[in-house]
């Protein structure tokens, strides 16, 4: 039995990322031993990379009212379709920039098999801050970090990730609310020893940490694609400008999404109260 599988989370509107993603994947991780699942909504990847299963997570499902499933619903359905307990989470705009240390990924996946109490191991320098050593090469992470449950490249125990999902949440709301749910549930996330790697130096999985921001290309992607002979019509999306304010329609949509997360907010209040009661009880003993 394989020790882990790989989930590349995406949506059909990001189809333009799939070919460059897997072209760089084949170049920088040609001997990847794990099965790769692409979490599409309805579409099927038809590129040259053969070891890719398009999940088409929304196909055949009734999605009333909205017409589209939420990010969390799609991720839940994908995780339920996978066959391993440990999942390497990636996204379609995490474009590889150098060779992957597949041996390190395998070692940490094996550690998760050996220690079923580990819910998550962050593998990137963009992960959560380290606190203290726990296992060889692994540190505990800071549960007070706002993005404790972040969506960067990580090994997840499938059931742990499923337990943090709430169907109404987007990726950004999951990172915000899911981080607090993980803290209040006393999940102890781990991160690789920060002294071993950095953004500029060694990385287990070297990649651009987000190739698309608010639907637009992140500038360094153009240089990466040019260097590898990857053609892309960048004018379709345009490039992200941090000085550009989102249009009024986008702000209205965001406000509507915030309103839809009222259940998450109520749940967190209850979890926080219980967490603080337990903390006070422990402090009084």
Feature-to-residue mapping (PLM):
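N-proximal low-complexity "stem/linker" segments adjacent to membrane-targeting elements
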Residues: 1-20
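Membrane-proximal basic amphipathic "stem/tether" segments
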Residues: 1, 227-285
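Conserved donor-nucleotide/metal-binding helix-loop-beta segment in metal-dependent transferases, i.e.
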Residues: 98-129
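Catalytic core and acceptor-binding pocket of nucleotide-sugar-dependent glycosyltransferases
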Residues: 148-216
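Active-site-proximal specificity loops/subdomain of glycosyltransferases
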Residues: 37-86
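Short, acidic, metal-binding catalytic loop of nucleotide-sugar glycosyltransferases
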Residues: 23-33
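Short beta-strand-to-loop acidic/aromatic patch adjacent to the donor-nucleotide binding site
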Residues: 85-95
């Amino acid at each position: 039995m394989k020790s882990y599988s790989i989930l590349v989370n995406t949506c059909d509107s990001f189809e333009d990322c799939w070919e460059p993603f897997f072209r760089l994947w084949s170049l920088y991780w040609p001997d990847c031993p794990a099965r790769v699942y692409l979490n599409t909504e309805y579409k099927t990847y038809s590129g040259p990379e053969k070891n890719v299963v398009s999940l088409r997570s929304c196909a055949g499902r009734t999605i009333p009212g909205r017409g589209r499933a939420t990010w969390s619903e799609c991720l839940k359905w994908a995780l339920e379709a996978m066959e391993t307990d440990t999942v390497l989470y990636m996204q379609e705009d995490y474009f590889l920039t150098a060779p992957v240390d597949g041996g390190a990924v395998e070692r940490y996946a094996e550690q998760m098999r050996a220690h079923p109490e580990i819910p998550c191991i962050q593998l990137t320098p963009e992960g959560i801050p380290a606190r203290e050593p726990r296992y060889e090469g692994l540190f505990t992470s800071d549960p007070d970090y706002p993005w404790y449950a972040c969506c960067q490249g990580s090994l997840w125990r499938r059931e742990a990730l499923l337990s943090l999902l709430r169907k109404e949440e987007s990726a950004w709301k999951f990172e915000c609310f899911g981080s607090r749910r993980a803290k209040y549930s006393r999940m102890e996330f781990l991160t690789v020893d920060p002294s071993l790697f950095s953004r500029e130096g060694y990385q287990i999985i070297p990649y651009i940490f987000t190739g698309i921001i608010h639907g637009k290309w992140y500038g360094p992607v153009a240089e990466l694609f040019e260097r590898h002979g990857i053609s892309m019509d960048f004018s379709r999306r345009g490039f992200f400008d941090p000085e550009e304010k989102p249009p009024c329609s986008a702000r209205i949509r965001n406000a509507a999404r915030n309103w839809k997360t009222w259940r998450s907010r109520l749940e967190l209040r209850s979890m926080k109260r219980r967490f603080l009661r337990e903390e006070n009880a422990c402090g009084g003993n």
